[in-house]
Every structure is written in structure tokens, then in C-alpha cells.
Amino acid sequence: MIKKETVLDVADNSGARKVLCIGISGSKKTASIGDVITVSVKKCIPVGKVSAGSIHRAVVVRVKKRSSSSIVVFGDNAVVLLNKQNEMIGTRVFGPTDSLLRRNKGFAKISSLSQEVFQ
């Protein structure tokens, strides 16, 4: 469950390392896997596609704690940065993702680029 002001890791090679959630799409209070949120880049590498302080959209690919008591639990909260057309800014995805991205949310490209997909 991701709320506003949550610091998240970035799971792609766009250049950002840490982002801050500043908005959740829709009228929801929390975001889960597959939801699109608005983030601000807080920490990044010097040579990258994004810069610190820039605002982007992102899709949640891993969460530490789920609202339902399911078996798959990840070790961190992570997102993949998107542009305005909901396409990935980076070209690679690091770490595991959940199969909910492919099945329910329509982000099949992220699932296919990830290192491991959990059911």
C-alpha cells in the first residue's frame, strides 16, 4: 500500500534512484501494484534521462505490504517511470514484478522486460 509522501525505489534504468509519491490517480487513498501515481524525483545519477526535482508518472511494480493477505511479499516499494503516453522512460526493468501488471492493468511490456515475474 503506497500513500502520499512515500519514498519509493525506481526499478528501471531511467537514471532516477529514489522518488517521492506526490499524488495517486483517481480518488483513492492508497495505491497498489499496477496503479499509476505521480512522483517527484529526489535522488538520481548525474548522467540520466531524468533530473532531480522533475515530476513524472509512474506505475507501482512492487509493494512491501499488500492490503490482502497474499503470499507474495516483496522486500521494497518500487516503481517504473512513465512518460505522458504511459510508455516506459527506461529500457530495462530490474528485480521481480507481479503478474498483476500483465493480467489486469495492461502493462505487459514491463512484465516482459522484468527479470522475474511472480504469480
From Swiss-Prot:
GO cellular component terms, semicolon-separated: cytosolic large ribosomal subunit
Stored SMART domains: Ribosomal_L14 (SM01374)
Database matches in InterPro entries: Ribosomal_uL14, Ribosomal_uL14_bac-type, Ribosomal_uL14_sf
Role description: Binds to 23S rRNA. Forms part of two intersubunit bridges in the 70S ribosome.
Subunit text: Part of the 50S ribosomal subunit. Forms a cluster with proteins L3 and L19. In the 70S ribosome, L14 and L19 interact and together make contacts with the 16S rRNA in bridges B5 and B8.
Protein family (similarity comment): Belongs to the universal ribosomal protein uL14 family.
Protein's name in the database: Large ribosomal subunit protein uL14
Organism: Neorickettsia sennetsu (strain ATCC VR-367 / Miyayama) (Ehrlichia sennetsu)
